[in-house]
Amino acid sequence: MTTWITICDTCKRDGWDQGDMALTDGERLATLIEAEAEGAVKTRRVSCLMGCARGCNVAIQSEGKLAYTLGDFAPEQEAAEGIVGYAKLHAESATGQVPYREWPQAIKGHFITRHPPLPSGK
C-alpha cells in the first residue's frame, strides 16, 4: 500500500504576517516535504486540515494502516526530513505503527491524533 503525506498548505503560524507573506507557512513546508519525499512516498496538498492552533499540520496515511496527524512544525528542512523519514517507516510497517525508538527526533512531540484504519468489507 502507498503511504501518503497530506500537507495543509494554508497553515499560518503565529508571526506569519510579520514576514513577506508571499507564501503561507504551509506552502513553504509543503515545498520542502515534496522535495524530500520525491520517489520515496507520495505527497498531496490540501487546503486546511483544521488544526490551525497547531500549524503547520500533516497527516500520514495508508490504506489498512493506522493514520497519524502531526502539527506544530516550523517550515524548515529539519521538519521536512523528520516527516518524510517517519512516513518511510510507516510505509515499511505492516500496521502503520512505528516503534518510538525509531522515530526521527524532529517529529517527537508533534503527534496530535492517531486514527485506526477503517474497517474493510461491510
Could you say what each language-model-derived stretch is?
Residues 54, 59-65, 86-122:
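Short flanking/linker segments adjacent to small metal-binding domains or redox-active Cys/His motifs
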Residues 1-6, 30-51:
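Immediate flanking context of iron-sulfur cluster ligation sites
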Residues 8-11, 48, 56:
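Functionally engaged cysteine thiol sites
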Residues 1-14, 122:
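Polybasic, low-complexity association/targeting segments
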Residues 13-36, 55-76:
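Iron-sulfur (Fe-S) cluster-binding segments and ferredoxin-like electron-carrier domains
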Residues 41-48, 74-101:
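Short Fe-S-cluster ligation motifs
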Residues 30, 34, 81-88, 108-109:
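Generic detector of well-ordered alpha-helical segments enriched in charged/polar residues
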